[in-house]
Amino acid sequence: MSDEEQTAIVCDNGSGMVKSGFSGDDAPRHLFPSIVGPPKNEQAMMGSAKQEMFVGDEAQAKRGVLALKYPIEHGIVTNWDDMEKVWHHTFYNELRVNPESHNVLLTEAPMNPKQNREKMTQIMFETFGVPAMYVGIQAVLSLYSSGRTTGIVLDAGDGVTHTVPIYEGYSLPHAIRRVDMAGRDLTEYLMKILMETGMTFTTSAQKEIVRNIKEQLCYVALDFDEEMTNSAKSVSEEPFELPDGNVMQVGNQRFRCPQALFKPALIGLDEAPGFHEMTFQSINKCDIDVRRDLYGNIVLSGGTTMFKNLPERLGKEISNLAPSSIKPKVVAPPERKYSVWIGGSILSSLTTFQSMWITKSEYDESGPSIVHSKCF
């Protein structure tokens, strides 16, 4: 591939946000919510606003009159027509490029169904006419972005959480843990426990308000029971201004919400392991010789790891589970909200990577299943 070839596009399609930009950049250029919305009823939209479907920020802004839908649930694309609209919006409206002249690197959650990545591959070549593409596993890209090739990544986004042990650049699939509990579940849990304040949040528009409350006010308690006791003794509330100008007070919900990450039973997932247990279980499924290296490189990734105190609490909980001779080290890169994208940008700009792209001619020869032999 000559140097004159157009820069590759890197697109990290999360359940909650699309992060897109160009290979070699140090941050994504465009971020928008992974949502599409047709109007709830045709009459509600007048004149120039009358279009079939809104995507991303525009859908967010008009959420009152739209029926918002997420095409990606728990990291898996559930509606391909809507997903195509999201990609079209990414290429033509956000990045303002013609995908026919750019290689495209996409990301996916580990343990995704095989047909999911085949369908992605097919759409890229057949609908968008890309010259070449690649599908990278999100957690592996995050580890690259932290400058490591060995470690265990705890990646928690909006739709899915997984712990992925990686040794010298290769993920260890037998030891991956995946739980369908992440940011969106916390938002729903917060909606539920905020009802105690007398407020009700039911519409998709109100759900976005609760997501903002979660991101701005919630934090992880280092010691949950102690925090509960203290909050019962003295009322500690934080104000939050609602879009209509009213102010609501948020109390112990601020730390009760993220507690579900360590105790999923709070949100009805009785069998699911918490963040600390997932990490511990993944490490224990690995060869005994690599465990110490993994304990020493527990790398956080994704927006749901951004809560205040989460790295400290995770380290404390894993210490309680691990052998006494082990001192776990939790690494929380400040840019971890975008580390999957950053890893994709780094990987796709390496000269050694250029032979890894799936080209159009390889696709024509082998069909969508080529993705399993070239992307692993």
From Swiss-Prot:
One function term, GO molecular function aspect: ATP binding
Subcellular location: Cytoplasm, Cytoskeleton
Entry-linked Pfam families: Actin
Chain ranges passing through the membrane: none
Enzyme class, broadest EC rank: hydrolase
Annotated catalysed reactions: ATP + H2O = ADP + phosphate + H(+)
Gene3D superfamilies the UniProt entry points to: 3.30.420.40, Actin, Chain A, domain 4
Enzyme nomenclature, EC number: 3.6.4.-
Keyword tags: ATP-binding, Cytoplasm, Cytoskeleton, Hydrolase, Nucleotide-binding
Keyword Hydrolase listed: yes
Predominant localisation class: cytoplasm
Entry annotated with the keyword Cytoplasm: yes
GO CC, alphabetical: ciliary plasm; cytoplasm; cytoskeleton
InterPro entries: Actin (IPR004000), Actin/actin-like_CS (IPR020902), Actin_CS (IPR004001), ATPase_NBD (IPR043129)
PROSITE patterns in the record: ACTINS_1 (PS00406), ACTINS_2 (PS00432), ACTINS_ACT_LIKE (PS01132)
Role of this protein: Actins are highly conserved proteins that are involved in various types of cell motility and are ubiquitously expressed in all eukaryotic cells.
Family: Belongs to the actin family.
The protein's name in its UniProt record: Actin B
Record organism: Trypanosoma brucei brucei
